[in-house]
A protein has these predicted regions:
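Cytosolic regulatory regions of ion transport systems
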Residues: 1-166
């Protein structure tokens, strides 16, 4: 989450990280990011939404991510609340897939962390065609397509992502 927040800040998109982990807080602050030591599920969570327009839940806890999305869905709307897929959602194909899943149907916390450790910086790729975009979205064993930035707008990629190259 720190590398994503750092990328967004670099492109003038304000972020605030919420965490209780002293190590995560220290790492975020050393990267120059705004971070709050606070439980996002606490009752005073509504005060945290004053300047926010999206929630991206990227904790190692599936339960925290799911509950945070449920809590903030009514505030931000279902198009602005995202979380990682759970291992059970990957394994049990019979489960209906929620639409708030980030990145892809198989990008869980473990895959995200393994790729971030291997490649700590986000790589920006210029898209020059529809075919190139589809290939990037569909062939992602060694990377996770995270977002599309066009001018001053950022779209996070989720399982129901539809974007047409223009």
């Amino acid at each position: 989450s720190i590398c994503i927040a750092f990328y967004l800040e670099k492109h003038h998109i304000h972020t605030t990280l919420y965490d209780l982990s002293k190590e995560n807080i220290r790492n975020a602050k050393s990267a120059g990011l705004q971070v709050m030591e606070r439980n996002i599920l606490s009752d005073d969570g509504d005060t945290m939404t004053e300047h926010a327009s999206q929630l991206i839940a990227l904790t190692s806890s599936n339960d925290v991510n799911i509950i945070a999305c449920r809590k903030f869905n009514s505030i931000f709307g279902d198009k602005n609340v995202f979380r990682l897929v759970t291992v059970n959602e990957i394994k049990l194909k019979a489960l209906s897939r929620p639409t708030d899943i980030l990145f892809s149907a198989d990008s869980d916390y473990i895959k995200l962390i393994e790729l971030v450790r291997k490649y700590p910086d986000l790589k920006e790729v210029e898209i020059t065609s529809s075919n190139q975009l589809q290939n990037l979205l569909n062939n992602n064993d060694d990377y996770i397509p995270i977002l599309i930035r066009r001018k001053n707008k950022v779209l996070f990629i989720n399982v129901d992502f539809e974007y047409y190259y223009q």
